[in-house]
Amino acid sequence: MATQALVSSSSLTFAAEAVRQSFRARSLPSSVGCSRKGLVRAAATPPVKQGGVDRPLWFASKQSLSYLDGSLPGDYGFDPLGLSDPEGTGGFIEPRWLAYGEVINGRFAMLGAVGAIAPEYLGKVGLIPQETALAWFQTGVIPPAGTYNYWADNYTLFVLEMALMGFAEHRRFQDWAKPGSMGKQYFLGLEKGFGGSGNPAYPGGPFFNPLGFGKDEKSLKELKLKEVKNGRLAMLAILGYFIQGLVTGVGPYQNLLDHVADPVNNNVLTSLKFH
């Protein structure tokens, strides 16, 4: 976690001095054989060694590099608001919870990004009936935007959904607060599969990693990085779905088809009336 950067005062002093020299555009010692510019740039920045981890830096600052040591998947020192700073005014939420929440929300976003566009796409290719091939905002999740005819009324479905999700989220929080505790509580004889790995974000086991991915540390590290990157992209995609729905009134797949058919008249600028 981010607080690992504070374990060794000597390594922190060295890291802070390296960052200070880079901001002053000073050359590193000749033994290193390279020099750095005064600004820490975005993804184009060459990998640097900070806290023992080689990584590119994205608009990192001296302060953010004091607690973001590269130990987290997808950590490039980017924290302009100081949300992960354990001692700063921005750190009003525990950094460990923020890192955990990003992974969980990224997984939900990846499922949502696919689930929101799937019915629309399947309807276009004729795999499901047109009456169910609806844009995501017309399925009843936003009542004014669409109607539906399910087995129960919307209030019953809402209460049922909240009860089921609330139970699952409560169990997940229990495991975060006390890792491994779910494997000690009886749960229909399945509790052994919920024992976890000691890391609540990556519980593993037959239910959460049935294919046994990440059997060694190197492959597990690569998979964690890929998951975080795709999760961040999916969260942006969900935001894009919302904006598209509000602006154009059609689903994301139809927006894509319209853009491909006529990119000059169907794009971000024309949709937002910047023309």
Curated annotation (Swiss-Prot):
Gene Ontology biological process terms in this record: photosynthesis, light harvesting
Binding-site positions, chlorophyll a 4: 230
Binding site for chlorophyll a 1: 78, 84, 102, 232
Location in the cell: Plastid, Chloroplast thylakoid membrane
Taxonomy, superkingdom: Eukaryota
Residues holding chlorophyll a 3: 227
Binding site for chlorophyll b 3: 169
Principal location class: plastid
Keyword Chloroplast: yes
Binding positions for chlorophyll a 5 per the UniProt entry: 226, 244
Note describing how the cofactor binds: Binds at least 14 chlorophylls (8 Chl-a and 6 Chl-b) and carotenoids such as lutein and neoxanthin.
SUPFAM superfamilies in UniProt: Chlorophyll a-b binding protein (SSF103511)
Positions of transmembrane segments: 233-253
Gene Ontology CC: one annotated term: photosystem II
Keyword list, A-Z: Chlorophyll, Chloroplast, Chromophore, Magnesium, Membrane, Metal-binding, Phosphoprotein, Photosynthesis, Photosystem I, Photosystem II, Plastid, Thylakoid, Transit peptide, Transmembrane, Transmembrane helix
A Pfam family reported for this protein in Swiss-Prot or TrEMBL: Chloroa_b-bind
Residues given in the record as chlorophyll a 6 binding sites: 259
Residues the entry annotates as binding chlorophyll b 2: 107, 142
Residues given in the record as chlorophyll b 1 binding sites: 58
PTM characteristics: Photoregulated by reversible phosphorylation of its threonine residues.
GO molecular-function terms, A-Z: chlorophyll binding; metal ion binding
Membrane-topology descriptor: Single-pass membrane protein
Residues where chlorophyll b 4 binds: 172
Entry note about domains: The N-terminus of the protein extends into the stroma where it is involved with adhesion of granal membranes and post-translational modifications; both are believed to mediate the distribution of excitation energy between photosystems I and II.
Family of this protein: Belongs to the light-harvesting chlorophyll a/b-binding (LHC) protein family.
The name this protein goes by in its record: Chlorophyll a-b binding protein 3, chloroplastic
